[in-house]
Amino acid sequence: MSISKAIEKVEARYAHQPEFIQAVKEVAITIKPLYDAHPEYDKLKVFERLVEPDRVFGFRVNWEDDNGEIQINRGWRVQFSNALGPYKGGLRFHPTVNQSVLKFLGFEQIFKNALTGLPIGGGKGGSDFDPKGKTDSEIRRFCYAFMRELHHYVNKDMDVPAGDIGVGGREVSYMFAMYKNLTRESTGVITGKGVGFGGSLMRTEATGYGAVYFLQNMLAAQNESIEGKKVLVSGAGNVSLHAAEKATLIGAIVLTVSDSKGTIYDAKGLNQEKIDWLKVQKDQHKPLADYVEVFGGEWMADQKPWSIKADIAIPSATQNEINEEDAKLLVDNGVKYIVEGANMPLTAEAIDYIRLHRVHYAPGKAANAGGVAVSALEMSQNSVRQYQTFEQVDERLQGIMKDIHDSSAQASEMYGQTDEGYIDYMSGANMVGFKRVADALVAFGILN
């Protein structure tokens, strides 16, 4: 079956899952030159197999709030592909979570994980539980209840979840404690743990730092440096603040961070003191707008960062945060590089627009793979009961991000997607990730 026919089949079968369809189409369109060059992929229906998860688990999560009321949420775990290793992907707690969102994230995770070159498959999970406004006791009770259900489907050799939006170190700790209580095993079943009980140094920083390392390689490919470049960052969570931190440390001028209520614009640029203040502010769930009272700058209520002149954008908030109108603003304001810190933060129309205007674009599956790369290193450390230093992990991370950049650029050129120095990282990354998984599926026959 041709790629176009496969897309039609997905659209018909999952018409009610727009995020998933968007992710599938983005990969399908860009891998066509590779797919056409390998008839064995079509013969064994590799693409059709990859768009269907191995399995999807759904479950009810009952928990008790501080008023003694029983609350009910939905939970899911999507085990998409274990062709390259155990299922690996985060858990997201957010009211927008549904099967479509988790399937899009799990599908992307297959190729992101493949790009790292590490032996991990792709999966994703989460719940429509909203941590905002909940007390620590309520979050703890929910995490315990969630893991009571999830523990049936995960273990260190089959499926290893991690954190994502709404799931940080606190939530991972609660879930890990419940897993140990239920199974009487202390294993590497979940990553993002505290360093004192099996976690890896640098896991917190990895996604944001990794995105900036990828950006450095993009700039170097164009004979440019990050020094003095003006950067727009969206979001104010873990990825956003660590991307801002690393960019600042190596000489960029980070002008913005944002949340759902608006954007901080600091024309002087962030520094370490300001970033440390922002980390505390977000950890304590206090308003981002307070920044202006402490450090000055401008609070742009109900606005995104994209109307500000800059060289680089790192969207790190959530999926589809940049639409076509935002993309036009970015181009009009001089942005030449876009690096996705979040998963699929650009709509399909926005991607088409920036590529048409030759903006250098790094898709999330390549640019934000640093988080899962260090998660895999945590799994390795757990298996041999040894820790690596921050410097050792950072060196590995820089090497992994360089390899992802270089392999994506080489694939772009090999399949005719590079034009007068403009590297099509989206096509390149999709082809590299897809080929690694597809070759494994061909080797396995029809059993995987």
Curated annotation (Swiss-Prot):
It catalyses: L-glutamate + NADP(+) + H2O = 2-oxoglutarate + NH4(+) + NADPH + H(+). InterPro entries: Aminoacid_DH-like_N_sf, Glu/Leu/Phe/Val/Trp_DH, Glu/Leu/Phe/Val/Trp_DH_C, Glu/Leu/Phe/Val/Trp_DH_dimer, Glu/Leu/Phe/Val_DH_AS, Glu_DH, Glu_Leu_Phe_Val_DH, NAD(P)-bd_dom_sf. SMART domains: ELFV_dehydrog (SM00839). PROSITE patterns: GLFV_DEHYDROGENASE. NADP(+) binds at T207, N238. Substrate binds at K88, Q109, K112, G163, S375. It comes from the Bacteria. Keywords: NADP, Oxidoreductase. NCBIfam families: PRK09414.1 (NF006929). Homohexamer. This is NADP-specific glutamate dehydrogenase. It comes from Psychrobacter sp. (strain TAD1). The gene is gdhA.
